Each structure stands twice: as C-alpha cells, then as structure tokens.
Swiss-Prot record:
Residues 453-480 have a biased composition (Basic and acidic residues). PANTHER family: HYPOXIA-INDUCIBLE FACTOR 1 ALPHA (PTHR23043), NEURONAL PAS DOMAIN-CONTAINING PROTEIN 1 (PTHR23043:SF25). This is Neuronal PAS domain-containing protein 1. Residues 45-98 form the bHLH domain. The gene is Npas1. GO terms for cellular component: nucleus. It comes from Mus musculus. Efficient DNA binding requires dimerization with another bHLH protein. Interacts with ARNT; forms a heterodimer that binds core DNA sequence 5'-[AG]CGTG-3' within the hypoxia response element (HRE) leading to a transcriptional repressor on its target gene TH.
Length: 594
C-alpha cells in the first residue's frame, strides 16, 4: 500500500531513478505530483548535445562544399581557398557556361562526351586524350600569345568565363570576375555602349557604322534575340555574319594603371573588345586587347612607324621627317592640314567614329584605312592615338598619333581626290602680249588703263586659261622670298581646318567659263571620272561641299564644329556628282573659312 501523503503543510521530495545517475526532483502537492524544473546539470547536457549536432551538420556541409569545389575547373590550390559564397557563385556560373557552350557552333562540350562503347575500364577515349593534350600543351600558349584576355558574357552581362591572363593586363583576379557583372568593372560612361553591343538596348540614332572587325568603330546594333543561328562560315562574310561581329572600346577598372596617367579616367584602362555575338543563346564571346602605354617614351618605335602630333580636331601640328620615306609628301606639306583631307572617302566614317572614341575615352586604335598620296593612290595605315597633356600647361591637350605603315603606295597616278589632280598652270603663248588684267587698274607711273572696249576685242581663250590655283606651301614660300607680287591675282587664302575643297581662285566673269565651258547650255565636261568617286563619297557630298569633314559628317562637338558646310564651288563640279548647282553660272561665293 502506498505511503500516504504527509499531513503537514511542508514539502516532501522523492528521488526517482535512484542508482541510475542524477535524481529527478518531484514536488508533492496536495492531491498532485508536479515535476520540478530541471537543474543546471541537465541544461548543460542539452546544450552540449545541440552543439555537437550543429558541428556535425557544419562538418557535413563543409565536406559537401569541399567536394563541390573540387569539381570546379580550377587548380586545387585555388579551389581549396574559396569561401562558400564563391563556390556557389562559380558553380552556378559553370553550369550556365556549359549550357552556353553547348548551344554554340561548333559546341564546346568535349568533356561531356562519354567514352566509346567497348573501351576497357581505366582507359580514356580519343576525345578526352586530345582535350587533355590541348589544355596542357596548347591552351596556355595560345592565351599567352593572344596579348589579351578571353571572356564570355551572357545576356545579363555577367562573366561566364574569363581567362586567367586578365591579371596580367588589369591586375584583377579570374575568380573575382567570374560570375560578376561586367558593369561593375567598366566606366559608367560606357554602360550604354555595352548594352547596345549586347543587344539589350536599341542603338542610338546616328550615321551607320560598318560592324567590321578591322574597324575600331563602335558598331551599333539592335536586339538579336529573335535572330536565327547563322550557318554561314566566316570566309563567306555574309551580311548576317557581319551583323554579329562586334568591335568597340571600353574603359575597365585596373589596379595597374598609374594614378594621373590617363587624363580621361584615372584607375581605368582602355580595352579594345573584338568578338562575335551569339544569336541562339544571347551572349558575347570576345577578346580584350590592351592598348599601348600612354607615354610615348614607353612605346618602341620601328622603321615603319610615323609619329604625328595633332590637335583635338585632328589637325596636324608636327610630324617626323621620316614621313617622306613612306609617302610622297614632306612635313611642310602636312603641317597645318586636317587628317580628314588625306583619308579615303570610304574610310572617313570609321575614322570619324575613332575620333569620337578618342575624345570620349582618351585612347583608341583605328582600323585599317587608306592615306591618300599627293601624286595619286594611297598607302594603308593603322594608327594608335592617345590624348596627352601638355607638360607646361595643364589645361592644354594634344593627340599623339602613331601610324603603322602597312603597305607601299598603291594605285599610283590614279587621282582619288581633288588635291591629287595636277595643277593647271597658265602658260602664255610667245606671240601674245603681256597678261591682261581682270579688271581696270588705276594709272601707274604715267600709264593709262586699257579701255574696256579694247579688252573685249582680245582673244577670250587667253583669258579663259588664267585660273587661279592655290600654290603649294613650298611655292608660296619661294614667292615670298623672291619678293615678286602679282597684281592681278590676290594672295591665296589660308586653308580651313576641317574642309578640303578644290580651290580655283576668284573666277572671272568672262564669256568663256572655266574648264572649257563655252556656253551655259552645253553639257559640262567631267572633272573627275566616275570611277574615281566611290558611292560613299557621293553620299557624303552635299550641294555645299565637294569633300568630307567633321562638319559634313555631323560631328557635333562644340570645339570642332567651327565651320559651316563649306564654300560654294563652280558648277563644273556638280554635274559630275549629279548635284544641282546652287549659285548662278560662273560665280563662286566667298564664305567663312575659304
């Protein structure tokens, strides 16, 4: 029989489970037995058990992360030092890269191909063997010989892959960049351009730019999400293939850039990106080239390189004397003129885009372009341009334009521009008297002026031959040294900075018009053969211009847009180009810059 509860009001305590460790206290209340709260010894046991369980879970989680890190295509010395967030980021990026690579043409997924059937266990298939040999013996050498770094972006602008050589050129880590957004490492002013190149934003309205790999221009393009996969090979150079080519310049963060070296953006480096857009899996596979260092002293100069010093408007301020070794022009004929005067018409648009990139980013590499010669033809050049500051004045800047001569003169004796035409020199016949004045002159030293009616009786052909031609710089200096002065012809006006037009001097109001135009009704002879004017030149010509320049190409920089469309020209130019002549017959209006 159970022991009755004590009748006293005191408490009784019973130790349960005696002999099996610590006892559990029980409180005996009248008619009810209540368990007492646990003591400090039991709480410590429960905490220890919880800590052991958490430690076991963390150990198992770390083991899984360690095994996952070993599956990443990274060296063991790097994968063992990764934290959990980096392992997750790199794993997700690697899965996206596998999917991105499988949709390529041809696909990159060589490791996914299993061994052929019937292969003995432990032996590798030919595909795996070739892949291993390529990675060990060729892959690293190719990356070292590229003089740049390879990267792949997805449609969101995140790095799916970037080669480890990025640390050589930018000082950034491959692990840090993989899986990160490219917009975190480029200059804020280049975000819109990268969006256009990826097709995530409509291209800005402007003159079309050929999306060529050899061009340094930033070829704008609309979204290519719905564009089908292109099956054409690169050798065919189909329009659809060229539409996916990308070539542009961006400023990326760099820990190797010296402070204050780049006048445009300190801490950034200009990278030339060339690659191809993926249409099926929208993304970009490209190669990033670093541009030569900004100081000219760090750039080795070879025999085929010519250094120019230009203004921000590409006006030649100085050039080396070795330019005469590769061209038929000397420094005296180039200084003071704009580079646009010597660029081939079909290359003017790309040079203009390179000019814009130079002013925006401070450094640029042009594509291959043709530099016109004085006697006809051209030579192929490629230039590296850098905006440099003046050591004496901090606010003044100029352009160092280093040109690589890539070929000898081609198409000699073939005029492609007006300044390449031979000068028309007025030659008087021996039987004729002295030159006739174009207007009545005041009496000099007792002589009387020739009456106007006597002037009409003279041969008009002699008057028609007298056409003012602008003298070359050498001839101009020779005439100044000799002290001779022509009373009938005014001095040649200074050449404007951004226009290049055919200059025939002040045309005289005679019955015989220049270039043999006897009557206004007769068809005008062709000044230039149609073969000398490519279609792009005819497209650049407007009724007020015969040549191209920044003003005619809508270059709307305030410090460049100084001149108008250019002076009006004789009507002999316009029938050749199929353009209406804006002025009256046989006249030429003097305008600003002429």
């Amino acid at each position: 029989m159970a022991t009755p509860y004590p009748r006293s009001g005191g408490r009784g305590e019973v130790k349960c489970g005696g002999g099996r460790g610590a006892g559990v206290p029980w409180d005996f209340l009248p008619g009810l037995m209540v368990k007492a709260p646990p003591g400090p010894c039991l709480q410590a046991q429960r905490k220890e058990k919880s800590r052991n369980a958490a430690r076991w879970r963390r150990g198992k989680e770390n083991l899984e992360f360690f095994e996952l890190a070993k599956l990443l295509p990274l060296p063991g010395a790097i994968s063992s030092q990764l934290d959990k967030a980096s392992i997750v980021r790199l794993s997700v990026t690697y899965l996206r890269l596998r999917r991105f690579a499988a949709l390529g043409a041809p696909p990159w997924g060589l490791r996914a191909v299993g061994p052929p059937a019937g292969l003995a266990p432990g032996r590798r298939g030919p595909v795996a063997l070739v892949s291993e040999v390529f990675e060990q013996h060729l892959g690293g050498h190719i990356l070292q010989s590229l003089d740049g770094f390879v990267f792949a972006l997805n449609q969101e602008g995140k790095f799916l892959y970037i080669s480890e050589t990025v640390s050589i050129y930018l000082g950034l880590s491959q692990v840090e960049l993989t899986g990160s957004s490219v917009f975190d490492y480029i200059h804020p002013g280049d975000h819109s351009e990268v969006l256009e190149q990826l097709g995530l934003r409509a291209a800005s309205i402007g003159p079309p730019t050929p999306p060529s790999v050899s061009s340094s221009s930033s070829s704008s393009s609309s979204s290519l999400v719905d564009t089908p996969e292109i099956e054409a090979s690169p050798t065919e150079a189909s329009p659809a293939f060229r539409a996916q080519e990308r070539s542009f310049f961006v400023r990326m963060k760099s820990t190797l850039t010296k402070r204050g070296l780049n006048v445009k953006a300190s801490g950034y480096k200009v990278i030339h990106v060339t690659g191809r857009l993926r249409a099926r899996a929208l993304g970009l596979v490209a190669l990033g080239h670093t541009l030569p260092p900004a100081p000219l002293a760090e750039l080795p100069l070879h025999g085929h390189m010519i250094v120019f010093r230009l203004s921000l408007g590409l006006t030649i301020l100085a050039c080396e004397s070795r330019v005469s070794d590769h061209m038929d022009m000397g420094p005296s004929e180039l200084v003071g003129r704009s580079c646009y005067q010597f660029v081939h018409g079909q290359d003017a648009t790309r040079i203009r885009q390179s000019h814009l990139d130079l002013l925006d980013k401070g450094q640029v590499v042009t594509g291959y372009y043709r530099w016109l010669q004085r006697a006809g033809g051209f030579v192929w050049l490629q230039s590296v341009a850098t905006v440099a500051g003046n050591g004496k004045s901090t606010g003044e800047h100029h352009v160092l334009w280093v040109s690589h001569v890539l070929s000898n003169a081609e198409g000699s004796q073939t005029p492609l521009d007006a300044f390449q035409l031979p000068a028309i020199v007025s030659q008087e016949e021996p039987s004729r008297p002295g030159p006739e004045p174009t207007e009545e002159e005041p009496p000099v030293d007792g002589k009387q002026a020739v009456p106007a009616d006597q002037d009409k009786d003279k041969d008009p052909q002699a008057r028609g031959k007298r056409i003012k031609v602008e003298a070359s710089p050498k001839e101009a200096r020779g005439s100044e040294d000799s002290g001779e002065e022509e009373l009938s012809d005014p001095p040649a006006p200074p050449r404007p900075e951004f226009t290049s037009v055919i200059r025939a001097g002040a045309l005289k109001h005679d019955p015989v018009l220049p270039w043999g135009l006897t009557t206004p009704g007769d068809p005008s002879p062709a000044l230039l053969h149609a073969g000398f004017l490519p279609p792009v030149v005819r497209g650049l010509c407007t009724p007020g211009t015969i040549r191209y320049g920044p003003a005619e190409l809508s270059l709307m920089y305030p410090h460049l847009h100084r001149l108008g469309a250019g002076p009006s020209l004789p009507e002999a130019f316009y029938p050749t180009l199929g353009l209406p002549y804006p002025g009256p017959t046989g006249t030429r209006v003097q305008r600003k810059g002429d």
